[in-house]
Swiss-Prot record:
Compositional bias (Low complexity): 177-187
GO function terms (MF aspect): single-stranded DNA binding; telomeric DNA binding
InterPro entries: NA-bd_OB-fold, RFA2-like, Rfa2/RPA32, RPA_C, WH-like_DNA-bd_sf, WH_DNA-bd_sf
Organism: Homo sapiens
Tissues expressing the protein: Preferentially expressed in placental and colon mucosa. Widely expressed at intermediate or lower levels.
Subunit description: Component of the aRPA, the alternative replication protein A complex, a trimeric complex similar to the replication protein A complex/RPA but where RPA1 and RPA3 are associated with RPA4 instead of RPA2. Interacts with RPA1 and RPA3.
Name this protein carries in UniProt: Replication protein A 30 kDa subunit
GO terms of biological process kind: DNA damage checkpoint signaling; DNA repair; DNA replication; DNA replication initiation; double-strand break repair via homologous recombination; nucleotide-excision repair
UniProt KW Nucleus keyword: yes
Amino acid sequence: MSKSGFGSYGSISAADGASGGSDQLCERDATPAIKTQRPKVRIQDVVPCNVNQLLSSTVFDPVFKVRGIIVSQVSIVGVIRGAEKASNHICYKIDDMTAKPIEARQWFGREKVKQVTPLSVGVYVKVFGILKCPTGTKSLEVLKIHVLEDMNEFTVHILETVNAHMMLDKARRDTTVESVPVSPSEVNDAGDNDESHRNFIQDEVLRLIHECPHQEGKSIHELRAQLCDLSVKAIKEAIDYLTVEGHIYPTVDREHFKSAD
């Protein structure tokens, strides 16, 4: 997983034909008489997200803002809770347990949709798409969808989501924080103190998670109770860092974590 930019999450081709159980490319209109060579659709600079982030985002058609940063194409991973075929599209309901399911519409021509079998309810899929809000309800316009063959993809998506949105936060802070002149010694002292404090918090959070005997791992609620002198924000920042670095991983939900050691 690269930390150099969002392009590392995307840059894949979505030019394959559509079928019920394989990678699928959306086609809004069919050409009945003349077949033309259509350019390949490229999915680049894809930002991994969870459903809650999409539903709480600010829409600026055809892009949207997450944490104040304009984002175009996104990916989500979740389980199909519903699949309905309409006259020219298939509507999936994708649930990743972070919010209510989001509708993801995959468009076809009227003739082609008759030949396509929707993916099965209950399977885990990865969806690449663009957020839309045509009637006031946010939904995804699917660019590509495929069934997860390895559940490690689910874990990788969670880690990429955490990393990507930490980068979004940093980008937002870098554009809003005013530059205040300080002496080099003040910069060094402040940096050393901040770094030491962050390391202490991370070490304490990791120790408590590592010592937890429960199968589901340590919850954020339990960490808050044991580290009552720390803010919730500081604890969650430590958890985000430890997750990205691979020291801990989420278990039953995004509130419980276990040590990877």
